[in-house]
């Protein structure tokens, strides 16, 4: 064989190494991209959870007497009669809107995520709203938050759960 000539086996080996390197690179890239998007959705869920729990216990909603009017016209569904004091009438009105869950979760700020909330005293659950995520399902990602507040001069806990199915674009 003369100078500068190449065997077919060398060409095949070089091509195989090159293709293997590309496959490895693409696999690593896809894995990193998937992780990035999962983390991004987790951050969005955390922002939604914080916003919802703050709005519910700190804001009366918009308009402030939304529970007395046409509920579909309300822009925001805060539950507070004053900061950290929950109105019984507002939570009862919100609970009655469970049949309008999809539009309500949008107005509450959950966006593309699902939402569940409950108001509990020391012994039982007083009110519930939304769809509870299945914590036994490994494909369900759930973020939870709890806020203390007053209801009729008693301490209650508002539990908020924002959840989504992992890997599914919500």
Q: Which residues are covered by each model-predicted region?
A:
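N-terminal single-pass transmembrane signal-anchor helix
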Residues: 1-29
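Long, compositionally biased, intrinsically disordered regions
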Residues: 23-170
């Amino acid at each position: 064989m003369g100078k500068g000539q190449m065997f077919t086996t060398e060409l095949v080996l070089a091509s195989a190494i090159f293709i293997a390197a590309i496959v490895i690179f693409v696999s690593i890239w896809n894995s990193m991209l998937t992780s990035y998007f999962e983390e991004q959705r987790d951050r969005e869920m955390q922002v939604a959870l914080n916003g919802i729990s703050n709005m519910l216990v700190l804001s009366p909603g918009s308009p402030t007497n939304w529970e007395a009017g046409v509920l579909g016209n309300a822009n925001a569904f805060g539950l507070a009669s004053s900061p950290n004091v929950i109105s019984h009438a507002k939570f009862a009105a919100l609970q009655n809107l469970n049949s309008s869950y999809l539009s309500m979760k949008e107005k509450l700020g959950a966006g593309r995520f699902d939402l569940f909330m409950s108001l509990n005293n020391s012994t039982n659950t007083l009110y519930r709203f939304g769809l509870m995520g299945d914590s036994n399902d490994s494909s369900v990602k759930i973020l939870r938050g709890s806020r203390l507040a007053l209801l009729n001069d008693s301490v209650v806990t508002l539990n908020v759960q924002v959840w989504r199915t992992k890997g599914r674009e919500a």
